[in-house]
């Protein structure tokens, strides 16, 4: 059974699924910038409402959203822990030598964890509602104007597409390898230490499989006489529609809302 991870696509025919991939990529960039400018929990609440609206319209099950974000939550945990010792304002709650945790550091850690989680949820919405080939085509079309100055737009799009395609397969093979190790009698213990030990036992067969898939992919591309963008055509042309304009308006409203909230706190 395939493991649902970041980069997986959930088939559907919602208004979000039908958006042009260029619109999703551009608005995704605006969303990231908007989320980075948020300076309060009220602003994060408006971003959270925006994300809930997206997933409600796209009709992607919540369990798949959480499953796609699960591999990235370790990054959130690391960022939160680092922020525990960054802001030392307010009353000190715990201290050990030069390390101390205060009310301000707890607030900062919670804020950064929420912000990063919302950013991941927003970007997961793009990969969950857009096939990899469409994302690759959209990314390539956005970079096409820079091809005149020597930027390899097609090659960069191909790299992004291959990376996104291999993420779910990488997660699936990691689970299969871990299950195979457990079925052969490998001890699986809970907690962070057990996870590190299990990761060490699956690392070699996992990366061996990754290199094998890479070699198979290169052989398949050579067999199909792939020589880059030259001479390639596309079956479906990318076109903007009314839905793309509406999505841009909604994203602009989110940006305006965040700006207003930030100005009120100044």
Residue ranges: model-predicted function:
Residues 61, 101-102, 241:
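A diffuse structural propensity rather than consistent per-protein peaks
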Residues 50-60, 74-78:
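Alpha-helical transmembrane segments and their membrane-interface exit regions
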Residues 1-41, 47-56, 141-151, 155-158, ...:
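Transmembrane alpha-helix interface motif
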Residues 60-66:
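Membrane-interface helix-boundary motifs at transmembrane edges
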Residues 69-185, 189-192:
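Juxtamembrane/interface alpha-helical elements of multi-pass membrane proteins
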Residues 25-26, 44-46, 66-69, 73, ...:
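Hydrophobic alpha-helical transmembrane segments
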């Amino acid at each position: 059974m395939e493991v649902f991870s970041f980069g997986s696509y959930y088939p559907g025919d919602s208004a979000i699924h039908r958006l042009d991939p260029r619109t999703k990529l551009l608005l995704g960039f605006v969303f990231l910038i908007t989320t980075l400018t948020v300076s309060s929990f009220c602003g994060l609440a408006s971003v959270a409402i925006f994300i809930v609206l997206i997933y409600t319209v796209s009709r992607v099950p919540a369990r798949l959203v959480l499953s796609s974000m699960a591999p990235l939550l370790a990054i959130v945990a690391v960022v939160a822990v680092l922020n525990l010792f960054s802001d030392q304002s307010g009353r000190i709650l715990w201290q050990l030598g030069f390390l101390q945790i205060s009310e301000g550091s707890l607030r900062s850690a919670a804020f950064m964890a929420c912000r990063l989680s919302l950013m991941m949820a927003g970007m997961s919405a793009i990969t969950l509602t857009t096939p990899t080939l469409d994302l690759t085509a959209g990314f390539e079309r956005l970079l096409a104007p820079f091809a005149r100055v020597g930027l390899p737009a097609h090659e960069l799009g191909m790299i992004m597409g291959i990376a996104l395609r291999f993420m779910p397969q990488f997660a699936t093979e990691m689970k299969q390898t871990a299950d195979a190790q457990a079925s052969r009698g490998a001890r699986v213990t809970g907690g962070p230490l057990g996870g590190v030990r299990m990761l060490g036992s699956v690392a070699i067969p996992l990366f061996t499989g990754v290199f094998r898939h890479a070699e198979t992919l290169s052989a398949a591309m050579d067999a199909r006489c792939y020589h880059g963008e030259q001479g390639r055509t596309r079956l479906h042309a990318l076109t903007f529609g009314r839905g793309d304009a509406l999505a841009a308006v909604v994203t602009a409203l989110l940006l305006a809302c965040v700006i207003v909230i930030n100005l009120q706190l100044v």
